[in-house]
Amino acid sequence: VAFAVTAAALSLAPAGSASAHDFLIGSSPAANSVQATPLSEVTLTFNDIVLNIGGSSSIVQVTDASGAHFETGCATTLDRTVSVPTALGRPGTYTVTYQVVSADGHTVSSTFTFDYQPPPGTTAAAGFAASRCGHAG
């Protein structure tokens, strides 16, 4: 009887976020923003918990117009937040490309850009030909 009541209650409940993919609700720097100071990390915040499968299921890459990579380590995941350490190069437009595993187990990926306009005299990192974590892209 208890099972039947529980099953009936669940069948009346609206489909919630458990069946929907996670989505980005914020980032630092923000999409389409101008970053005027040196940046030590890029942080992405999602609407639900991002799964951390084996410690390598979240990928975040930060590249410039030439395709050079400016992430200095691998992405880390904590609840709804994914971060990657960075050291940016010359002023210009940077692209953040991410792939995470949503709370429902599906992969979610997208990109956004921001402009980097540091003060004159700021040291520019050289960047890398490939991701520091061995991910293609």
Can you annotate each of these PLM segments?
Residues V1-A20:
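Secretory targeting and sorting signals
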Residues L39, P91-T93:
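Extracellular Ig-like/FN3 beta-sandwich strand-entry sites
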Residues S19-P38:
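N-terminal edge beta-strand
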